[in-house]
């Protein structure tokens, strides 16, 4: 549904929400809604990641009768207070207060958490296997989201892994990403610590990094750890000047930073998981690496040593990003979903 059609039908609706993933919400806040975010002490707007839009309003509590729908956030860490107490309790408490409007929940994760979920499954009487851990997570997510209007996920594979969900693939606006002259550098940007080694592909990352340095003399720059970006401009400048971007993730659904790298004209080397092979064509607009650090390191090294080819692939990747991860399409997908939810609620 396009913006003009939605506004003619519903006018400027009011949405209740709260901070979660700043970069994702920066795009959501481009939707033609009146946004109200809850002030609390668990999640705050990340000014380093994105500037806060001026039209965003802040409220101290939820006021029944004031809003048209609520947009809340969850991920696999929220399935138990023992995993992430703050996020878990924030979701439960806020969700429990909202009874007069439909709730849409964005599930930002997948049930890939073998460090924790098999043990949780064992506590519930199952064998402590990774498969049972996924089953446990599916059930707990269904319990947590019972009664919500829709659960939105970030990849088609996430729908399969959770067993349900409405996929909306993220979208960006090409004008906001800087495709600059490239320096012969490889970078990555994944979570540096905490639970989630398989989810983020940290072992593949670290092993690839070691091989690159020892075998090829190449430094893999870890954004957020090796390179601190003071603000979004600094990040876009550094990413836009990087020749190669490496994405090692396994469970992360459609990693946003990989898409940002594609918009920035980087030559992307990525694992195939969560649908990357739907849009990356080997040697044309990027590279799909095996879950093998020797293979990923070789692909990266080949691109660092073949600057011209890497730039050409990066340009094809940018064309793909503009087509597949289009911001206008992202917003239209959201307007279509919100229209459906509001229509269904109106008929109750």
Regions found by a protein language model. Name each.
Residues 1-83, 289, 348:
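N-terminal pre-catalytic "stem/leader" segment of glycosyltransferase-like enzymes
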Residues 37, 164, 171-232:
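Conserved catalytic-core segment of nucleotide-activated headgroup transferases in glycan assembly
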Residues 60, 64, 88-94, 111-150, ...:
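Membrane-proximal helix-turn-helix segments that form the acceptor-binding/catalytic region
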Residues 236, 258-263, 277-278, 284:
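Short alpha-helical segment that forms part of, or immediately flanks, the ligand-binding pocket
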Residues 249-250:
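Aromatic "clamp/platform" in nucleotide-sugar-dependent glycosyltransferases that forms part
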Residues 267-270:
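Short hydrophobic beta-strand element within catalytic cores of glycosyltransferases
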Residues 280-283, 287-293, 302-307:
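Conserved acidic donor-binding segment of nucleotide-sugar-dependent glycosyltransferases
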Residues 291, 305-345:
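A charged, aromatic-enriched C-terminal amphipathic alpha-helix characteristic of glycosyltransferases
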């Amino acid at each position: 549904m396009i913006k003009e059609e939605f506004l003619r039908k519903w006018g400027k609706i009011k949405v209740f929400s709260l901070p979660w993933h700043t970069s994702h919400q920066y795009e959501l806040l481009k939707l033609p809604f009146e946004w109200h975010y809850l002030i609390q002490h668990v999640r705050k707007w990340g000014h380093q990641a994105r500037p806060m839009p001026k039209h965003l309003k802040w409220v101290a509590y939820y006021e029944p009768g004031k809003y048209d729908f609520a947009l809340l956030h969850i991920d696999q860490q929220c399935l138990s207070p023992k995993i992430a107490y703050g996020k878990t309790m924030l979701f439960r408490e806020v969700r429990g207060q909202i009874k007069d409007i439909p709730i849409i929940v964005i599930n930002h994760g997948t049930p890939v958490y073998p460090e924790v979920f098999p043990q949780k499954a064992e506590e519930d009487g199952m064998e402590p296997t990774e498969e049972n851990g996924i089953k446990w997570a599916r059930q707990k997510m269904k319990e947590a989201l019972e009664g919500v209007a829709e659960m939105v996920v970030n990849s088609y594979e996430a729908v399969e892994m959770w067993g349900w969900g409405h996929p909306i693939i993220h979208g960006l606006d090409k004008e906001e990403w800087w495709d600059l002259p490239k320096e012969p550098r490889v970078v990555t940007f994944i979570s540096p610590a905490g639970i989630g080694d398989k989810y983020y592909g940290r072992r593949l990352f670290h092993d690839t990094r070691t091989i690159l340095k020892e075998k090829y003399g190449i430094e893999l720059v870890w954004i957020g750890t090796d390179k601190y970006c003071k603000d979004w401009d600094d990040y876009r400048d550094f990413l836009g000047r990087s020749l190669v971007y490496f994405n090692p993730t396994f469970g992360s659904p459609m990693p946003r930073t990989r898409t940002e790298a594609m918009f920035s004209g980087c030559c992307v080397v990525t694992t195939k998981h969560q649908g990357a092979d739907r849009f990356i064509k080997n040697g044309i607009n990027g590279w799909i690496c095996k879950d093998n650090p020797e293979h990923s390191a070789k692909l990266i090294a080949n691109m660092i040593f073949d600057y011209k080819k890497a730039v050409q692939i990066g340009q094809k990747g940018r064309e793909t990003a503009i087509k597949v991860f289009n911001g206008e399409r992202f917003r239209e997908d959201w307007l279509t979903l919100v229209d459906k939810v509001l229509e269904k609620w109106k008929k109750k």
